[in-house]
From Swiss-Prot:
PROSITE patterns recorded: LISH (PS50896), WD_REPEATS_1 (PS00678), WD_REPEATS_2 (PS50082), WD_REPEATS_REGION (PS50294)
Alphabetized UniProt keyword annotations: Cell cycle, Cell division, Coiled coil, Cytoplasm, Cytoskeleton, Microtubule, Mitosis, Repeat, Transport, WD repeat
Record's function text: Positively regulates the activity of the minus-end directed microtubule motor protein dynein. May enhance dynein-mediated microtubule sliding by targeting dynein to the microtubule plus end. Required for nuclear migration during vegetative growth as well as development. Required for retrograde early endosome (EE) transport from the hyphal tip. Required for localization of dynein to the mitotic spindle poles. Recruits additional proteins to the dynein complex at SPBs.
Taxonomic lineage from the root: Eukaryota, Fungi, Dikarya, Basidiomycota, Agaricomycotina
The gene coding this protein: PAC1-1
The name this protein goes by in its record: Nuclear distribution protein PAC1-1
Comment block on domains: Dimerization mediated by the LisH domain may be required to activate dynein.
Family from the record: Belongs to the WD repeat LIS1/nudF family.
WD repeats: from-to residues: 106-147, 149-187, 194-233, 236-275, 278-336, 339-380, 382-425
Record localization: Cytoplasm, Cytoskeleton; Cytoplasm, Cytoskeleton, Spindle pole
Superkingdom of the source species: Eukaryota
A GO biological-process term: cell division
Length: 438
């Protein structure tokens, strides 16, 4: 019984036939086509031209990468056995320091979003050049380019298992790519259509069955991945919805907009739970605070009541050059963080819960101490505006360190602290992606 699907067998047979035709072995190729009942004629621009050779080279490259990965894993295991506690303690508060470990170049237009694969050392970058590129962040090597959108790509997100990658674009579409099918020539996955203007963000909701998207058409839409149907449209913002992001348990959905507000919604009903007003310009980015940061935020705001409910606090970044931290339940602004000299474009909470990192058009990353609101570090990161940043993937409690590779150190300081790989990625208008490692 063949392990290949019918489509894969057809692609393989046609690739072999094309190779034979290219070698002027026409009689053998014709005989093969007849024997396999294959309806195929060689053409100069056929998608099968050179495909067999490419596959062969890919296998050799994958074998080499497998050997390298096994060697890195063996070295890592030896390192852990020599002193795991000391390594964890030394790295738990790691923060990025210039210069970046890798500067990834291949895009031909500004980078718009970056996202880490949850298991492997892969990084996806979206760009205004209409493509998504996949990189190995541990080695800094380029893996592949995904082509399918016809205009700028604004958002990219992996599901929790890394089986699917969602992207969104100015071409009004959302695409869902099966990561196991990347090597198939011409594959562009499922396409979700319904937005009436640029789709600016796409996010998998916890459980991976649903996707949330935000658009310049002023709506947020919830999509069913299996059927590609839009099952809910959320309205309320008065202008372009720049970003939407779910809370860790999926019970809340945050959004921010060109109407200068941020909002929190019930994604099941579409009902708005809270509106946040205070920014004096477009709100570009929103992030839910993880449980690990709650103690520091309460200290910052002088709050006594403790809560462990996901989605209790959010941070927003705006073109007014400030970052604001809010209490979701009351809508109260807890603190404004000022220091950037230009638009805020990216926010991420440090996995230790002690810091908040922000990225700006002033070309810097700033590290804020959450308990005091003090800017404790400024990193000169890019030669042009920074458009996005992302911290490495979380490793769930009880997760095997084998899920990480190389120097992706796993960290944990308590029950509420999310263990994460110490890696940060930033994207810029300078058309590069920077990878920051210890």
């Amino acid at each position: 019984m063949s392990i290949l699907s019918e489509r894969q067998k057809d692609d393989l047979n046609k690739s072999i036939a094309e190779y034979l035709y290219a070698q002027d072995l026409t009689e053998i190729a014709d005989s093969l086509c007849a024997r396999l009942s294959l309806d195929y004629k060689s053409e100069p621009n056929s998608k099968y031209a050179g495909l067999l050779e490419k596959k062969w080279v890919s296998v050799i490259r994958l074998q080499k990468k497998l050997i390298e990965s096994e060697n890195r894993y063996t070295a890592l295991q030896e390192d852990i056995a020599a002193g795991p506690a000391r390594r964890r303690d030394a790295q738990v508060d790691w923060l990025p320091t210039a210069p970046a470990r890798y500067t990834l170049t291949s895009h031909r237009a500004p980078i718009t979003r970056v996202a880490f694969h949850p298991t492997f050392s892969l990084l996806a970058s979206a760009s205004e050049d209409t493509t998504v590129k996949i990189w190995d962040w541990e080695t800094g090597s380029f893996e592949r380019t995904l082509k399918g959108h016809t205009r700028e790509v604004w958002g990219v997100d992996f599901d929790s298992k890394g089986s699917f990658l969602a992207t969104c674009s100015s071409d009004l579409s959302i695409k869902v790519w099966d990561t196991q099918q990347w090597d198939n020539a011409g594959y562009s996955g499922k396409t979700l259509r319904g937005h009436e203007h640029t789709v600016s963000t796409v996010k998998f909701l916890p459980g991976d069955d649903l996707i949330a998207s935000a658009s310049r058409d002023k709506t947020i839409r919830i999509w069913e991945v299996a059927t590609t149907f839009c099952i809910r449209m959320i309205t309320g913002h008065e202008d372009w919805v720049r970003m939407t992001v779910p809370s860790t348990d999926g019970t809340l959905l945050g959004s921010c907009s060109s109407d200068n507000t941020a909002r929190v919604w019930d994604p099941t009903s579409g009902v708005m739970k809270m509106e946040f007003r205070g920014h004096g310009h477009i709100v570009e980015v929103i992030a839910f605070a993880p449980l690990a940061s709650y103690a520091a935020i309460r200290e910052l705001a002088g709050l006594k009541a403790a809560t462990k409910a996901p989605g209790a606090y959010i941070a927003t970044g705006s073109r007014d050059k400030t970052v604001k931290i809010w209490d979701v339940h009351s809508g109260q602004e807890l603190r404004t963080l000022s220091g950037h000299n230009d638009w805020i474009r990216g926010l991420v909470f440090h996995p230790s819960g002690k810091h908040l990192l922000s990225a700006s058009d002033d070309k810097t990353i700033r590290v804020w101490e959450l308990s005091t609101g003090r800017c404790m570090k400024v990193v000169e990161a890019h030669s042009h505006f920074i458009t996005c940043l992302a911290w490495g993937p979380p490793v769930q409690a009880g997760g095997d360190i084998k899920a990480a590779s190389g120097s992706g150190n796993l960290r944990g300081t308590g029950a509420d602290t999310e263990r994460r790989m110490n890696v940060l990625a930033t994207g810029s208008v300078d058309q590069t992606v920077c990878v920051w490692l210890p």
